[in-house]
C-alpha cells in the first residue's frame, strides 16, 4: 500500500524486533491514515529535496513499544492524530537536513538525536512527527549525559 509517492506502508512498519519476536506490527485503518499524513506532509517533501530517506523506525504497535522499552504513548504508535519516524539520509549532514525539515515542513516534533557535530555529520539520526490536530513546531537535541538521555531546545 502506498502512503505517498515514494513511501509504502511496508517501509513504515518493518521491524526486525517484531519479526524476531513474532509481534504483530500491523496498524489499524486510523493509524494508517496518520502514517499517510506523516508521509505526505513530512517525509515526501524531504525525499523530494534530499533524495532517498532511510527510515530506521516508523510505526510501532503498543506490543512492539513494550518489547523495545519504549512508551506506549510514543508518537511512533500513530495514535491520537499523530505519527512519527526515525530516519537519516546517507551521506548528508543530519543537522543540515533537520534544520531544513524544521523550516520547510509542518513538523510537530523534530529531534536531532545523538548528533556529534559537523566533524561527524552522519552521526545520530532524526526523529520527526506530524500531528493532524496540533503542530508544536518543537525542535530538540537528544544527547547522553551521565548515562541518561536528555533533551534541550535546538536553536535555529
Model-predicted segments: where are they?
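Extracytoplasmic cell-surface/polysaccharide-interacting catalytic and binding patches
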Residues: 1-47, 121, 145-156
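A residue-level signal for beta-strand positions that form part of recognition/binding surfaces
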Residues: 6, 52, 84, 125
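Charged/polar, solvent-exposed surface patches and flexible loops
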Residues: 37, 48, 66, 96-103
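Extended, low-complexity, intrinsically disordered C-terminal regulatory tails
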Residues: 40-70
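Short His-Asn-centered micro-motif
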Residues: 56-58, 88-91
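Short, surface-exposed glycine/acidic/tryptophan-bearing loops
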Residues: 62-85
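Catalytic cores and adjacent binding grooves of peptidoglycan-active enzymes
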Residues: 79-83, 89-156
Amino acid at each position: 500500500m502506498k502512503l505517498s509517492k515514494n513511501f509504502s506502508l511496508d517501509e513504515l512498519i518493518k521491524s526486525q524486533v517484531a519479526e524476531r519476536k513474532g509481534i504483530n506490527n500491523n496498524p489499524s485503518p486510523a493509524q494508517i491514515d496518520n502514517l499517510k499524513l506523516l508521509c505526505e506532509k513530512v517525509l515526501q517533501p524531504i525525499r523530494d529535496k534530499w533524495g532517498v530517506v532511510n527510515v530506521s523506525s516508523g510505526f510501532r504497535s503498543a506490543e512492539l513499544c513494550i518489547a523495545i522499552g519504549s512508551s506506549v504513548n510514543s508518537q511512533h504508535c500513530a495514535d491520537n492524530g499523530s505519527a512519527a519516524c526515525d530516519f537519516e539520509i546517507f551521506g548528508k549532514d543530519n543537522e543540515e537536513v533537520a534544520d531544513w525539515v524544521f523550516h520547510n515542513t509542518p513538523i510537530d516534533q523534530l529531534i536531532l538525536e545523538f548528533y556529534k557535530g559537523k566533524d561527524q555529520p552522519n552521526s545520530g539520526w532524526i526523529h520527526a512527527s506530524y500531528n493532524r490536530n496540533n503542530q508544536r513546531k518543537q525542535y530538540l537535541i537528544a544527547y547522553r549525559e551521565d548515562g541518561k538521555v536528555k533533551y534541550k531546545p535546538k536553536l535555529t
